[in-house]
Amino acid sequence: MTTALDQLKQYTTVVADTGDFQQLAQYKPQDATTNPSLILKAVQKDAYKPILEKTVRDHRDEPADFIIDRLLIAFGTEILKLIPGRVSTEVDARLSFDTQRSIDKGRELIKLYEDAGIGRERILIKLASTWEGIRAAEVLQKEGIKCNMTLLFSLVQAAASAEAGAQLISPFVGRIYDWYKKQAGADWDEAKNGGANDPGVQSVRRIYTYYKTFGYNTEVMGASFRTTSQITELAGCDLLTISPDLLQKLQDSNDTVERKLSPDALHDKPTERVAIDEASFRFQLNDEAMATEKLSEGIRVFAADAVKLEKLIDSLR
């Protein structure tokens, strides 16, 4: 029997969402994604402490953010030994509202990879999908630095990212689902709001349809999954980045996976493009409570984990 994971790979590029690169080989993903929280989680495992300790030892007198950059590249370099495609490395979330510093950091990370012998075509620089982050991506893309727009929860963020020429976006399925479920409280009906009706799934489907309708080349990579159902409902999406535990569940399953998204079979196609000047972007994002709250929360969480990582580094000096 063909596994659900193998069936999914027929329709979609499968990406592993982890800093725990020792788990990669068994799932044979094309690409991999990391973020500050995943790197923090990984370096607290015995298997990866030597990477952290060596990076600190080699740069003991440098600032913590300097060491974090080298740590990100150390993980990215190891990951790229195990996959044929690209790795996504994230810009510090504390720069999410600073266009120029985000540009500078993106350039620095690419230079570090190139100094390690890795071409920029194998790297995606992750930026938060704020107005400032999207403007940074616009500049970096023109320099041949490919960007992955993360913490994306709304069509307006997706539309602005595509207009800026971003290589890829990462709409967060699970976190959208979490928000609506929390808002509903005891009234949440999983049978009614799951599967194809999952609000996170619907958001990605809407973005995918928008991109394909208007001919954008920006890749859509669904992210932040809670269940295998959310994943299989998006079979056919350009890419899906999936945690190791859900990759394992898909590998253990022989359930049939059918293609749900295709550029040749679009439904509810939009007739107009979204207005994405700065004022319109900010108003539309503000008007969508879920997207506003989850973007803010996501930046806070990633920033807090960066601080925790800095403290961990300082404790090893």
UniProtKB/Swiss-Prot annotation:
Catalytic residues? 126
Entry's Gene Ontology cellular component terms: cytoplasm
Q: Does the entry feature the keyword Iron-sulfur, yes or no?
A: no
Q: Where in the cell is it found?
A: Cytoplasm
Q: What does this protein do?
A: Transaldolase is important for the balance of metabolites in the pentose-phosphate pathway.
Family indicated by similarity: Belongs to the transaldolase family. Type 1 subfamily.
| Protein name (database record) | Transaldolase
Record lineage? Bacteria, Pseudomonadati, Pseudomonadota, Betaproteobacteria, Burkholderiales
In the UniProt record, the gene name given for this protein reads tal
